[in-house]
């Protein structure tokens, strides 16, 4: 692939890690953010120490506070901003874009107010003549590992397979590999909903339960994620892939996962507001729990783990009692995903 110009919107941990992948591939990378000290640090010290204390970035990776400068003459735009501001940033991008670009996003969540997936938001806010079909970049990926060039395999999903193949070529190298998929609904819902299950797995750890319980919540969590996704129009096979079971494993078993760490803290009895303050990063699984619970209630989808976590976070139920309560639920077949 020839050298491409890519704007990455959101210089958080994942946006920064992906900027390095693209830079390693010889592309022109521009990070955009709205925190002056962070932007100055990236440009002058070539570090982003809030997320990576010991990593020095290549000097070719630049950052700006000026969205117009970031978008000028780019071939592709990657959204890596928190779910709750995706629509706002998309509107700002739409007001500036003056040429067609490949639009990608690598965030994992559902909009709280509308319950919409992020690709839908981008399609609504950015005129079709200025963008490709949206490409979703998702899968089992800790930024802490990608930034040190550890082997990572993820998915590029789009309704337009050619757009997905473009993104596959854009990012893939000797340590970072993408597979294509056309099931956007499946890939996005898997990426968003697995954060809920990671909170649950972390809570079990915080409560002192062992590997048996953690394996159970991850596998039964996959079942309820699949049930909801299929109801929304996804292919059930997607949940067996990188963006499904792959992402669920990496997020539901690792201390690198902010959702897992948040769940572990909840299990230890810490207050949510203290957890969010101490972590200093967005915990997407907290907001997604509420959205998924509401969707499941509207559609009549059985999601006991999501319900237990929802009641603990939003209704003040004791998290241990909520989890143990699932043990007395109605008996079911293991393979029910519909």
Curated annotation (Swiss-Prot):
It comes from Streptococcus pyogenes serotype M28 (strain MGAS6180). Catalyzes the reduction of the glycolytic intermediate dihydroxyacetone phosphate (DHAP) to sn-glycerol 3-phosphate (G3P), the key precursor for phospholipid synthesis. It catalyses: sn-glycerol 3-phosphate + NAD(+) = dihydroxyacetone phosphate + NADH + H(+); sn-glycerol 3-phosphate + NADP(+) = dihydroxyacetone phosphate + NADPH + H(+). Pfam families: NAD_Gly3P_dh_C, NAD_Gly3P_dh_N. Coiled coil: none annotated. It comes from the Bacteria. Pathway: Membrane lipid metabolism; glycerophospholipid metabolism. The keyword Ligase does not apply. It is an enzyme of class 1 (oxidoreductase). One of its GO terms (biological process) is phospholipid biosynthetic process. Transmembrane segments: none annotated. Gene3D superfamilies: N-(1-d-carboxylethyl)-l-norvaline Dehydrogenase, domain 2, NAD(P)-binding Rossmann-like Domain. Belongs to the NAD-dependent glycerol-3-phosphate dehydrogenase family. Sn-glycerol 3-phosphate binds at residues 108, 139, 141, 194, 247, 257-259. SUPFAM superfamilies: 6-phosphogluconate dehydrogenase C-terminal domain-like (SSF48179), NAD(P)-binding Rossmann-fold domains (SSF51735). It is found in: Cytoplasm. One of its GO terms (cellular component) is cytosol. Its EC number is 1.1.1.94. Keywords: Cytoplasm, Lipid biosynthesis, Lipid metabolism, NAD, NADP, Nucleotide-binding, Oxidoreductase, Phospholipid biosynthesis, Phospholipid metabolism. NADPH binds at residues 13-14, 108, 143, 258, 282, 284. The active site is at 194 (proton acceptor). This is Glycerol-3-phosphate dehydrogenase [NAD(P)+].
């Amino acid at each position: 692939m020839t050298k491409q110009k890519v704007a990455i919107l959101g210089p958080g941990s994942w946006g920064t890690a992906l900027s390095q992948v693209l830079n390693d591939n010889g592309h022109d990378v521009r990070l955009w953010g709205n925190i002056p000290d962070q932007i100055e640090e990236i440009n002058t010290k070539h570090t982003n120490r809030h997320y990576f204390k010991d990593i020095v970035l290549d000097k070719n990776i630049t950052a700006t506070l000026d969205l117009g400068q970031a978008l000028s003459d780019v071939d592709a735009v990657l959204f890596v901003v928190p779910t709750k501001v995706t629509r706002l940033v998309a509107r700002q991008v739409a007001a500036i874009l003056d040429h067609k670009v490949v639009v990608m996003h690598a965030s994992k969540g559902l909009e709280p107010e509308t319950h919409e997936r992020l690709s839908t938001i981008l399609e609504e806010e950015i005129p079709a003549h200025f963008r490709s079909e949206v490409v979703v970049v998702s899968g089992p990926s800790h930024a802490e590992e990608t930034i040190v060039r550890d082997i990572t395999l993820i998915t590029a999903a789009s309704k337009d397979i050619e757009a997905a193949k473009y993104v596959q070529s854009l990012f893939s190298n000797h340590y970072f590999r993408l597979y294509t998929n056309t099931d956007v609904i499946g890939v996005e819902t898997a990426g968003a909903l697995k954060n809920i299950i990671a909170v649950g797995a972390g809570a079990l750890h915080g409560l002192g339960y062992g590997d048996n319980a953690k394996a159970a919540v991850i596998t039964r969590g996959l079942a309820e994620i699949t049930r909801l996704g299929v109801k929304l129009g996804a292919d059930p096979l997607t949940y067996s892939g990188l963006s499904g079971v792959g992402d669920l494993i990496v997020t539901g078993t690792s201390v690198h996962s902010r959702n897992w760490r948040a769940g572990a803290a909840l299990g230890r009895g810490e207050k949510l507001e203290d957890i969010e303050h101490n972590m200093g990063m967005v915990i997407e699984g907290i907001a997604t729990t509420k959205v998924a619970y509401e969707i499941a209630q509207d559609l009549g989808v059985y999601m006991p783990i999501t319900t237990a976590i929802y009641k603990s976070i939003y209704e003040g139920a004791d998290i241990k009692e909520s989890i143990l309560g699932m043990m007395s639920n109605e008996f079911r077949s293991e393979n029910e995903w519909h």
